[in-house]
Amino acid sequence: MTTNKTFSMVLAMTLNGGIGYQNRLPWKLKEDLQRFKKITTGGIVIMGRKTFESMNSKPLPNRVNVVISKNMKSSNEVQVFPRIEDALQFYNTSHQKLYLIGGKRIFEEGLATDKCSDVHLTRIGVETKCDVYLNKNIFSTFQVNKTSQTKSENGINYDYQHLINKNSHEQSYIDEEHQENQYLDMITKIMKEGVSKDDRTGVGTMSIFGQTMRFNLAQSFPLLTTKKVFFRGVVEELLWFLRGNTNGKLLLDKGVKIWEGNGTREYLDTIGLQHRQEHDLGPVYGFQWRHFGAKYKDCQTDYSNQGVDQVKEIIQLLKNNPDSRRIILSAWNPIDLKQMALPPCHVMSQFFVANGKLSCMMYQRSCDFGLGIPFNIASYALLTYMLAKECNLNLGEFVHVLGDTHIYSNHVEALKKQIERVPYPFPLLKIKGNKSLFDYTYEDFELVGYNAHDKIEMKMAV
């Protein structure tokens, strides 16, 4: 006799397929266990004998407990069947939902029945020690319905994903979607609604105006995963800003080419800076952050104690007057704009403290969604992490306010490829030691659990 009864699967798995270690879960995630309880309570949970034994042979409360075994016998607390198909047939007319909860053999045999309607998957971002693995592509025939925002607990980054078979209408149990979807959805919006515009570079853009994205910094670090982001470049550029540097060669010597195109002899000559030495970028971000109002000469001059050191003032305000509404960092100085190789794109940021949590809101006038924005998100998130550590604050949000929000015409095909990708959990960020904000090096920053799709090549418009 055949059955039309379907079931859901509920499991946690690393990105390489790890699900268990020594007949136990390899991680302790309290929130994930609470979610498991929320999903399965009131239903029928189907498990293998080893999974049942890993629970000290105690049935889960408020659920019908079913064990698949040829050796065990049914009791008042547990129903036993030799095969999954037998359990499905027995509960064919039951109004209760069925959930397969492990282990490996149960998941594999369950998929072989072709009765799995959906999967509630917890994706573990860190490869912890495991001795039981599923094929990491075991759910490749399912569609992603929803992906949650990244969470963290006990040094482990993870998220929830709801996978469905076509025609499934099961509940996802996901309240807040992955925050990288904001970025991907914005690309789609620009492609659908963007106005074609000429621009300074001659490449041309599709543009919209006045958008916002928000990232929760307390749970994870928002380094995009749908393409690999050059994190070392993000760090080195920010440290270069914080030191007040304007010499692009210092970045080039470290293999960071972000500013290379804007510092060449040819480029500087075309914007009227023939007197400037190659890779002297003028009074750009770092100069404005550390010496706002000082007279710029060249990148070799010592500007100590000249102008306003906005970064130091921010640190003092965060420590001594965190409720101030004047904790602002500005890179836009109209007097200096013509001396800059490139006027600031990320113009101003404001810092806000509530309940001991530090948040940052940054306004960006020109927003290159293909190349620039992934860097900008990570850079200001990193700055907020560093300021929070310096001032003994917890982390809040990064709010990104977007002015001219655009895609360059030569990035369209690459971005079409990117928006088809499903994000991985955001990584965690650890800052080692207790150095001054101005003394950190790249080696002081550690990404934990960064998994990303392959890099996508896009040419920078200069």
Swiss-Prot record:
Keywords, ordered alphabetically: Methyltransferase, Multifunctional enzyme, NADP, Nucleotide biosynthesis, One-carbon metabolism, Oxidoreductase, Transferase
Catalyzed reactions per annotation: (6S)-5,6,7,8-tetrahydrofolate + NADP(+) = 7,8-dihydrofolate + NADPH + H(+); dUMP + (6R)-5,10-methylene-5,6,7,8-tetrahydrofolate = 7,8-dihydrofolate + dTMP
Region (Thymidylate synthase): 180-462
Signal peptide: none
Residues binding NADP(+): 12, 18-24, 49-51, 68-71, 102-109
Superkingdom per UniProt: Eukaryota
Pathway: Cofactor biosynthesis; tetrahydrofolate biosynthesis; 5,6,7,8-tetrahydrofolate from 7,8-dihydrofolate: step 1/1
Location of the DHFR domain: 6-165
A single GO BP: one-carbon metabolic process
Tagged with keyword NADP: yes
Keyword set includes Transferase: yes
Function of the protein: Bifunctional enzyme. Involved in de novo dTMP biosynthesis. Key enzyme in folate metabolism. Catalyzes an essential reaction for de novo glycine and purine synthesis, DNA precursor synthesis, and for the conversion of dUMP to dTMP.
The protein's name: Bifunctional dihydrofolate reductase-thymidylate synthase
